[in-house]
Amino acid sequence: MRDIRLIRAPSNLGLRPLRPGHVPGTWRGPEALAGLVEALAPVAVVDLERPAYSAEAEPGTRLRNGNAIRRFKLELADVVAKAIGRGEWPLVIGGDCSLLLGALAAARRSGPVALVHADGHSDFRHPGNYDVNAMLGSAAGMDLALATGRGEALLTEWPGIAGPLVADEAVVQIGERNSRDPDFAWADINATPITRIDVFTAREMGAVAVLEKTSAALARADCPCWLHLDVDVLDQTVMPAVDSPGSPGIDPDDLVAMLSPLAVDRRCIGMDMTIFDPDLDPTGELARRLVSLLGRIVRPA
């Protein structure tokens, strides 16, 4: 059984406020998911300090909280890299999706890395597909674009790493639910070598076939991989406590069947789980559901 280092990263920096004065509640995710300590029996728990959130623009960047995001991701990268160096398996609990950048920056210190991006959205917004002067960018909706080198240098260039955090060819995106909409915001992802399995295709193929296609893409990449799980990949009837809920979504049992074999594979060097908002879970029922789900993925019976 692998040694898990549980890294709790209480960040909401990459999210937009949903209304004036709103502060996204994802920063409370790690605390609400405290049951993971008992469920996963990690060898250690690391708590990062919550960074201050601001909804306002700042000089030198069109990314909301851009400078704070970079600082926090560099801190996270150091913690994740130390875990990998010890032979442990870092599990980062957020927090918003921009945490992925810090995790990948850590993984890349040891060489190329592949990425399985399980998310109800491709998070591929970048200056090539929206007007940066019309609105502030939210890094949590841009994480895959940033990870593949598209966007401001503030979040695409990292110390000691040449090129993007991950190559297009080494990415598998699972679960996008808006890709067939006529106004799909980042249709340019379709012109990339990223392996894309939208939610409709995933449901048609079934979990076994999705796993086979994902595994084949990872074999071609031929390098260690990182797993990213945004819990909005689940249907909103199952997991409504997220920033951008939607339907359809991946069935929880299917998600376990798709991700658990990847998580326990020796070439998987870590995982993050993001976007759960406890403010939208007043009873704690959804938090308990996520603890159970993650336990099934990373500690299968």
Where are these regions (language model features)?
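Conserved alpha-helical scaffold segments that buttress catalytic/binding sites
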Residues: 2-301
